[in-house]
Curated annotation (Swiss-Prot):
Pfam families: MM_CoA_mutase (PF01642). The gene is mutA. It comes from the Bacteria. GO terms for biological process: lactate fermentation to propionate and acetate; propionate metabolic process, methylmalonyl pathway. Its EC number is 5.4.99.2. Keywords: Cobalamin, Cobalt, Isomerase. CDD domains: MM_CoA_mutase_beta. One of its GO terms (molecular function) is cobalamin binding. This is Methylmalonyl-CoA mutase small subunit. InterPro entries: Cbl-dep_enz_cat (IPR016176), Me-malonyl-CoA_mutase_sm_su_N (IPR024067), MeMalonylCoA_mutase_a/b_cat (IPR006099), MMCoA_mutase_b (IPR004608). It is an enzyme of class 5 (isomerase). Belongs to the methylmalonyl-CoA mutase family. Pathway: Metabolic intermediate metabolism; propanoyl-CoA degradation; succinyl-CoA from propanoyl-CoA: step 3/3. It catalyses: (R)-methylmalonyl-CoA = succinyl-CoA.
Amino acid sequence: MTVLPDDGLSLAAEFPDATHEQWHRLVEGVVRKSGKDVSGTAAEEALSTTLEDGLTTRPLYTARDAAPDAGFPGFAPFVRGSVPEGNTPGGWDVRQRYASADPARTNEAVLTDLENGVTSLWLTLGSAGLPVTGLERALDGVYLDLVPVALDAGSEAATAARELLRLYEAAGVADDAVRGTLGADPLGHEARTGEKSTSFAAVAELARLCGERYPGLRALTVDALPYHEAGASAAQELGASLATGVEYLRALHDKGLGVEKAFAQLEFRFAATADQFLTIAKLRAARRLWARVAEVSGVPAAGAQRQHAVTSPVMMTRRDPWVNMLRTTVACLGAGVGGADAVTVLPFDHELGLPDAFARRIARNTSTILLEESHLARVIDPAGGSWYVERLTDELAHAAWDFFKEIERADGQVAALRSGLVGDRIAATWAERRKKLARRREPITGVSEFPLLTERPVEREPAPAAPPGGLPRVRRDEAYEELRGRSDAHLEATGARPKVFIAALGPAAAHTARATFAANLFMAGGVEPVHDPVSVDAETAAEAFAASGATVACLCSSDVLYAEQAEAVARALKSAGALRVFLAGRGEFADIDEYVFAGCDAVAVLTSTLDRMGVA
């Protein structure tokens, strides 16, 4: 085969080279068409997106944005993967989660899932899941020499570990065939529940036992989900997990375990969100950070971090939960491309209670489709070489390292957690994010955008309650969920939802965009829009409003028609009994009580509206 020169392989070889200056001029022209007078770098900034942690995503990345060399897969700093072959041999480990307190029900689900694509089991034990005494029944019929098991037992970690090891021995499983993690995570449990960890002795003993007898079994899990579920940014999640990992290394070393052996006993668990590029960068940055810890510990070859990625519970919604299938698909893709060793796709009904068989099937099939039909695991580190991904990985790693150093200056994760430093930093991040959610700057499809008021509620059996205390647990949809709950209660009590009359002025071309915007905004709070007749004026508005059954109204039209008719129509609506008259857009008009527009505080508007309507 003839090898072509480089220019023969380049699709752009016959085109003249473009420069940043040329691109900036073209961008200026586009941005100016939107009414903004910008030039130079300001045009690029207008198209940039500010992320949490002080990071910025720009619209264009080129070779001059190249990050430091990420090395090769399987070699320090392990950015491109913990092993040279990545997930190519068989794809990532498809790990399903089980949290039912019923051993028989858990066993039925486990066997069904293992027969249909699941490759390992993640069992939640103790007060938040399955009783430790039910572990044997739950694993009845499971070939323990073939199926890795990951435990998550909180304060009962040592007891659960001993029970699992007893089951391995009873089943005659060879020591070198035992695989999985015992899941001891005293600091993660403290972060989640507030229960202080007084001793690492039991954990160290488990680590020593695994190191000496079970080479495929890890004793500890560094679970970053408690921080993510409290509202942490990606860098805070990474920084807290890094600090926790370092605490465990110190504790194990103090108990006599060698540094290299201590590294081999840790598995890390991270959240994967629907922000696919941030998820990819987060997992790559996590490996780089852990490799740095191994390097300064004098064992650089031990820094290959084992990762378990879980689709984010924070992003899941209770309303229109079917959309969660789309969110978890993107999150799973990000986790796989990011190089996670094991991936758990939470069922779409996760936030509603215990998943049913259909939800579990969709969850496991998400990985199957991405692996078997989309062939995501056929390429090692497919995001590697992307200037954007490499730069985002580098910037995120630096931001996480800064947070890690702040924790270390506070005497480590134990002290920082108990002093409130970690919780305070995360709370501040979540407060800013809540503002974006309230203003719909971070849209939630099916909740704050395009809600479906006529949806039938999805009901599930309640999951075991998580222990109280510790860091708070947040959800993106919580403010809108509260508003929708008030609307539901009103519907049950009166037979109708609170209503808003959409007073559309002029032809469809003039009012459709703002009428659609207003309808979606009010539905996000459970307020039903009434848009009949299609168009009104000052003479017909009062009669139409009275017939609508609504108690508030919202004018929707063009700026030109607002100038001509808004004040007269608003007076007519108030004369007909409207408690409040809104206008979709901005301006200063008599008899208009409030303006709704892109970026307004939708939660505040909807809360005050329901209050005035007497909706409890």
